[in-house]
Amino acid sequence: MATEEPIVAVETVPEPIVTEPTTITEPEVPEKEEPKAEVEKTKKAKGSKPKKASKPRNPASHPTYEEMIKDAIVSLKEKNGSSQYAIAKFIEEKQKQLPANFKKLLLQNLKKNVASGKLIKVKGSFKLSAAAKKPAVAKPKAKTAAKAKSVKAKPAAKPKAKAVVKPKVASKAKAVAAKPKKAAAKPKTVAAKTKPTAAKPKAVVKPKSKVKPAKVAKTSVKTTPGKKVAAVKKVAAKKVPVKSVKAKSVKSPVKKVSVKRGGRK
């Protein structure tokens, strides 16, 4: 017979669970992004404050140093150029409101203009270069041209109101011009009147000239006809220019007729 072994209940003791310390790792990306956003905000806040506090610059109480230097050199008119001391003295006398470091700034601008070729340095004195002299002469011309244009533009606006008056003056001038024409027309009528008077003596001369040769022809029949006919022709030839001459020439043939009558007696 098989013997049955008693079943012994074995108790299992649970093993202790060793728990390792867990390190919580926070994501690095959000940690970095948050400080950047904060830095940008702080920068913007700092940048906005000086802008609000910035004041507009006061306009300079004097022209640029380049203009002042050119003005000093041109007005001093020194052959060998003007020294720094002479230029500074001239500018100080002309410009009253200058900064405390004026002489230092003047020296810097002199060196700058020499380097750019606008000024020429000769033994410690400064001259204007040929390129710098030309614009200095051209600028006043441009200003005068602009002034002349503005002066011409102003009178151009005024004639609009006087435009109504001008036609009246023109009409008066036309009327005055028309009067001399009428006066010129009158001499023509006078000339026309004188022409008929000149024509009257011609009409008077013609009948006399016709009568005279008839009388002479009678005498020519009695004596030698050949010679007297020639004489009559000469008289007729003389009478042709008498027509163009004035009335005084008409008296001469009357005297000849009287002489011929005496011959008949």
UniProtKB/Swiss-Prot annotation:
Species in which this protein is naturally found: Pisum sativum
Compositionally biased tracts (Low complexity): 1-27, 186-202, 216-226
Pfam (any one): Linker_histone
Parts of the chain that traverse the membrane: none
Top-level lineage group: Eukaryota
Family that this chain belongs to: Belongs to the histone H1/H5 family.
Bias-annotated ranges (Basic and acidic residues): 29-42
Domain H15: 61-130
Cellular component annotations (GO), alphabetically ordered: nucleosome; nucleus
Species lineage: Eukaryota, Viridiplantae, Streptophyta, Embryophyta, Tracheophyta
InterPro entries: H1/H5 (IPR005819), Histone_H1/H5_H15 (IPR005818), WH-like_DNA-bd_sf (IPR036388), WH_DNA-bd_sf (IPR036390)
GO molecular function, one term: double-stranded DNA binding
Keywords for this protein: Chromosome, DNA-binding, Nucleus
Compositional bias segments (type: Basic residues): 43-55, 140-171, 203-215
Subcellular location: Nucleus; Chromosome
Region Disordered: start-end pairs: 1-66, 131-226, 242-265
Function: Histones H1 are necessary for the condensation of nucleosome chains into higher-order structures.
Gene Ontology BP terms: chromosome condensation; negative regulation of DNA recombination; nucleosome assembly
Protein name (Swiss-Prot/TrEMBL): Histone H1
